[in-house]
Amino acid sequence: MKIGIINTKIRTVFSAFACMIAASLVCTMPARAVVEININKGVIEPLPIAITDFLSADQLGSNITSVIAADLERSGLFAPIDKGAFIEKISNPDAAPRFEDWKVINAQALVTGRITKQPDGRLKAEFRLWDTFGGQQMIGQQFFTTPDNWRRVAHIIADAIYERLTGDKGYFDTRVVFVDESGPAQKRVKRLAIMDQDGANVRFISDGRALSLTPRFSPNRQEVTYMSFEGGSPKVYLLQLETGQRELVGNFPGMTIAPRFSPDGQKVVMSLLQDDGSANIYTMDLRNRTTTRLTSSQAIDTGASYSPDGSQIVFTSDRGGRPQLYVMGADGSNPRRISMGDGSYSTPVWSPRGDLIAFTKQSQGQFSIGVMKTDGSGERLLTSGFHNEGPTWAPNGRVLMFFRKAAGAGGPKLFTIDLTGRNERQIQTPNFASDPAWSPLLE
């Protein structure tokens, strides 16, 4: 049986790092599917899914399939079935599969596809997602891209599958900026780097001659703000990723640390260290370079992070003794403490969904990554150990990335964990790595 094109819709995707991708929606089933994943019910049994090698004239089809499978498996929501168990060999991805062959191996969803080279040198990637027990096609799309951009196509396909089966946006077509750490501990070289969310395509964006820390993406993904010790004193800089151009964010007399963009990208919030040892939170409007002081305490106020709607800011302050989490209006009004547990809290970051705040907690000799509701209730620790720090949210608010350093020799490594705390994965990087920051979805 052939599945014809029911509806065609072209969309164009641009990226600062990739060529144009055009996508066409070719077929969808009714809105209610037999197979779906309810990601709001707590602990979830991963969905068995069969992902066949995409037909191609070379190894590229298999490579794309491997990236898709790895993305979905790493989310903890999917269990890709071993290809050795497949009964049917897909020879025509345009035709409906033999659903009974896939039901026998309990493949509740099936992905088929094809990669072909076009006369202009571009690649055409097609895929279809099937509900095997419902006997229907759920989604079908095709993409055009340059050969060197094949990994991004794989991530986009994985996002489409994730969204169709969970109802939530995926997070695979994203990047992470982080601090790459190389060399011996006494002479550690720290460079800013960018990679795909799965650790591939690492690119360095600083040379390591000056210590650089706390990189953070702008909402449009075109800029990074970070702290550099160039000249011996920490200052906040703004780096244009496409051109490499950078500029100082505010020529303050003291040290500036912990920068982060506002949700609209028009401001940077940061902390300014005072001569008396205190630190207060300031914003700089990037349009006119005006600064506004938000806190005026004798304490250390730092680690500010906006709510997704830009109306509130969460930050760390030791004004009550130990470092705790506080929330205030974006104009500095009505500061109130929200963390009430034992220990010290730091590195708060607001979820893109607006419902949770992630943080680092130090208590009883351990560092934990946790989340709480925005009023401080419902605190949950997701992972604990010798040193876990610096959570950053995936753009769908379902997964966190952080860095961990084990006791003894060695250095920090990057990990992801979901909100159940059960699905923890290491992200492979060329060297030691710390202080990650997740980008929004690419476009």
UniProtKB/Swiss-Prot annotation:
It holds the Pfam family TolB_N. InterPro entries: 6-blade_b-propeller_TolB-like, PD40, Tol-Pal_TolB, TolB_N. Residues 1-33 form the signal peptide. The keyword Cell cycle applies. The keyword Nucleus does not apply. It is found in: Periplasm. GO terms for cellular component: periplasmic space. GO terms for biological process: cell division; protein import. Keywords: Cell cycle, Cell division, Periplasm, Signal. Part of the Tol-Pal system, which plays a role in outer membrane invagination during cell division and is important for maintaining outer membrane integrity. Belongs to the TolB family. The Tol-Pal system is composed of five core proteins: the inner membrane proteins TolA, TolQ and TolR, the periplasmic protein TolB and the outer membrane protein Pal. They form a network linking the inner and outer membranes and the peptidoglycan layer. This is Tol-Pal system protein TolB. It comes from Brucella abortus (strain 2308).
